[in-house]
């Protein structure tokens, strides 16, 4: 389990052990746009509207190294025909922006630089040596990893899975 990449399902497991409203049908909505032009999503709501819980849920559902089936059994999403299609089939980059905002607050340039640095560092530790130039950033590194590995997110159970998926919470 990484700090940002393949973070695991502990966050959602903790939510499941508490009282919570089942919003797992959000997963069905994301699955519907997964391989379309509309696949880039931004979830914005006021404070205290459950964004963090939703992102923990999405992370637990998609995160490839996990086995989250038991967490979702009995929840609304488990009754959908395509429940298993994307379950634990994707590499996930999980960012909770509050961590970065607390540390780097009003300095947007520093904030972006540290996000790039921290995630690149973790990617390089996971996926080995990747040739980078001094001008490369996170997006360049993601493209190079997919090019060099033939698709980081692929697995035997989910051969069609997209290289990397990113979910951002702020």
Short names for language-model regions:
Residues 1-170:
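Phosphate-binding site recognition
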């Amino acid at each position: 389990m990484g700090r940002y990449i393949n973070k695991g399902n502990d966050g959602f497991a903790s939510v499941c052990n508490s009282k919570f409203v089942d919003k797992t049908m959000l997963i069905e909505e994301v699955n519907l746009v997964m391989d379309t032009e509309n696949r880039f999503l931004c979830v914005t709501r006021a404070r205290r509207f459950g964004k963090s819980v939703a992102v923990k849920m999405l992370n637990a559902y998609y995160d490839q190294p996990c086995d989250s089936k038991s967490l979702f059994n009995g929840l609304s999403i488990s009754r959908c025909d395509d429940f298993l299609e994307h379950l634990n089939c994707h590499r996930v980059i999980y960012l909770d922006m509050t961590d970065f905002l607390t540390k780097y607050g009003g300095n947007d340039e520093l904030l972006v630089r540290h996000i790039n640095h921290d995630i690149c560092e973790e990617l390089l530790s996971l996926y080995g040596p990747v040739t980078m130039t001094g001008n490369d950033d996170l997006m360049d590194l993601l493209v190079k990893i997919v090019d060099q590995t033939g698709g980081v997110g692929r697995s035997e159970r989910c051969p069609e899975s997209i290289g990397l998926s990113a979910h951002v919470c702020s």
